[in-house]
Design a protein with these regions (language model features):
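Conserved coil-to-alpha-helix start sites within the AMP-binding
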Residues: 87-92
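Short beta-strand->loop structural element characteristic of the AMP-binding/adenylate-forming
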Residues: 84, 101-111
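A short beta-strand submotif of the Rossmann-like class I SAM-dependent methyltransferase core
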Residues: 58, 83, 149-153
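Phosphate-binding glycine-rich loop
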Residues: 36-80, 94-97, 104, 128-141
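Conserved donor-binding loops in enzymes that form glycosidic bonds
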Residues: 13-14, 106, 155
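Active-site phosphate-binding strand-loop segment of PLP-dependent enzymes
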Residues: 110-159
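N-terminal "arm"/small-domain region of PLP-dependent enzymes with the aminotransferase-like
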Residues: 1-33
Length: 159
């Protein structure tokens, strides 16, 4: 008979060592526990300084961050976004929220990442590129929709 362990495996256990407890208390005391407030501004400024960019935006989760990225790239309901068929649902939700159509590309057996050969094949057989105001615009032949983005998600995250 196998004896079950009673040892807890910590998963997403809050770690409020250091100043975190005070920061959480400050947020609760001031009522700023959502998308704005002094700590959000400090975080965005720290990211700007660390990365050397002019603008940074804090989002409530990865889905919102991906959606903002798609919006900033100009993706709209007249577009198609290509994504791997093995991905976290946030990627596809962000595309869906942008109004764009999703086209899934199979992943490579060795890496589980979007298969570049299949992507190239899909683009060569399903799209045409024209120049509008000296800028290339690639459209799906069947629908006429613009290829708004290719989202080659790293499926294994931080592993």
């Amino acid at each position: 008979m196998v004896k079950m362990s009673t040892k807890l495996i910590p998963l997403s256990v809050p770690n409020l060592n250091g100043n975190e407890w005070q920061y959480v208390k400050d947020c609760l005391d001031t009522g700023w526990i959502s998308s704005a407030g002094a700590y959000v501004n400090k975080f965005e400024e720290a990211i700007q300084n660390y990365t050397g960019v002019k603008y940074a935006i804090a989002c409530m989760n990865g889905t919102a961050g991906l959606q903002v990225s798609l919006n900033l790239a100009g993706v709209s309901s007249n577009d198609i976004v290509l994504a791997p068929n093995l991905t976290f649902v946030a990627s596809l939700n962000a595309i869906s929220y942008s109004g764009a159509e999703i086209a899934l590309i199979d992943v490579c057996e060795d890496s589980w990442q979007m298969d570049i050969d299949l992507l190239q094949n899909w683009l060569e057989n399903n799209t045409i590129t024209n120049f509008v105001n000296e800028k290339p615009v690639t459209r799906e032949i069947a629908s006429g929709k613009k290829i708004g983005a290719i989202m080659p998600v790293y499926v294994l995250g931080g592993f």
